[in-house]
Amino acid sequence: LIQILILMPYVDMSLNSQMIDMVDEYANAYFNDAPIIEVSGRTFPVEVRYLDSVEDRDRGVQQQVVQLVDEIAEEHYGPRGDILVFCPGERQIRDLAKALRGRDRIQVLPLYARLSNAEQNRVFNPSGRGLRVVLATNVAETSLTVPGIRYVIDPGDARISRYSHRSGLQRLPIESISQASANQRKGRCGRVAEGVCFRLYSEEDFLARPEFTDAEILRTHLASVILRMLELGLGDVRKFPFVDPPDAKMVRDGFRLLTELDAVDAHAKLTPIGRAMAKLPVDPKLGRILLDAASRDCLNEGLVIVSALSVQDPRERPPEKRAQSDQQHARFNDSRSDFMAWLNLWRYLEEQRQALTQNQLRKLCEREFLSYLRVREWREVHYQLVVSCRQMNFRVAPMKPDDEQYAAIHRALLTGLLGNVAQQDEGRRFNAARSRKAQVFPASSQYKKPPKWLMAAELVETSQVFARQCAAIEPEWLLETNPLLLKRHHYEPAWSARSGRVMAKERVSLFGLTVSDGQRVHYASIDQKTSREIMIRDGLVSNNFRQAPGFLKHNQTLVSEVMALESRVRRRDRSHPWRRGRRCRSGQRGRGGDRRSRRTRRPCG
């Protein structure tokens, strides 16, 4: 945008943000002190209370929250009002809900991204029955506004998505929030009346925190950004004037993934595959899957799976009905692959969509623990990808039976998920690519009976590294992937009389995982000099051939003829008078009875 304004100063641009401080900073630094217009909604004063007591800090967060809820219900801090409690994740929400349930006139309502629509509607449609306590992740910080909130309880932490270039994992660590996020949370109350924000940390802690949360470009994988910039011809990514420049290691890691996907060459230029990937409105890994699926005549199946991986899981698991929902979803499971479950679910929904009205389909989704809105989003993304593929002249053929297509589908998936392959170590623990350790996610169909080799849609680190969306694969499929990624080590070269060549054992590895070991290969194409020495020593000299080559047969025939000629000459020498062995006058056996010297011959004795 800055470059556009330099080239075209007549262009008007508006920069909008919920945080006026950040707009002020950017306006001063990049936009020549452009005017700032602040539009604020009607708010009431909010009192901030910090946890300054040492005794309070020693207690657990859950115990502090429960006590505060009880005190608010007893009107210790003013009139009763609904409470919004921020929690780092779903597990903390469940634990806190369990601790709060059973209290009179208190309605506990969870709120997080994977919650079913019915449960979310309870939060946004107050029933008027008792004091509402909304337990929410940071989704309620900016994305949603919960009505009627008068009190906010802020423990001061959140689960923040952060990519690690060292481990190659998208991590979800629980971190302390920034001052800006804390103020956003404070702003959730004071909308309908005066509010109170309880911060379960000290004021010194708050002032020591960073002013803003790291920009997303600093904590996410850059492959998609780099691919788009290369397509647009924006020059060297490493020299691009980002507002928040990413770490050079993150840029290198983005190029590494694009190289792995065969999207860029050794000179960091787009390959034909990379240019095709840039035309698809999905993550580069998913785009690579679609390109390979088209070449294997399983594009239709690939479109269903890729579109499913591009949206939030439509399968819902309400905490109080987990067993029932799991039973409903188990109908679509495949013992070999979680990816095939998407195909099974898609076929079922398409059949129902053809037979039912839209309202009936909505009710069916509700009964069978499926989010109707997410199912609809899945279909919309699928349609968008179908249009993109047809514009690229790809043929979208009808689906075939799963048994026929399993290998083709998963080989296509491998091209995009090559960095997420893993080899079984012990039980459910796996050695993943690049020296990582991972465990099969409990919700996977591969959890109870893990395969020897698997690939995962993602490796995510929470309490530990989990492989999510898994499928069994054959190690032989890995040998057909990008040859530049396979490392081959050869050992024990030896002469083979049976094949008439020098053979060696080969060990093939991918990202540190041994794919095959012990297969014998022709060594001459690997080390011609050593092979020649071994062939001469153990083959030619030792005459160790099962079937001698033509030149050797010719040489052996020639040697035999020379030896036969030599033998005949020796026999003639023995028949010569000088070789008859007559005795001389002195009784010694000599040559013709004469003593020979170099130049003369004289009688002995």
What are these regions (language model features)?
Residues 69-72, 100, 189, 385, ...:
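Hydrophobic, Leu/Ile/Phe/Ala-enriched alpha-helical segments that form helix-helix packing faces
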Residues 242-247, 512-524:
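Extended, non-catalytic structural segments that build the interaction scaffolds
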Residues 79, 105, 110, 153, ...:
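Second RecA-like catalytic domain
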Residues 32, 102, 483, 537-541:
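Short, intrinsically disordered, mixed-charge
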Residues 511-515, 524, 528-529, 533, ...:
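Sequence-structural signature of the catalytic-core scaffold of metal-dependent phosphohydrolases
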Residues 1-289, 393, 397, 424:
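P-loop NTPase motor module signature
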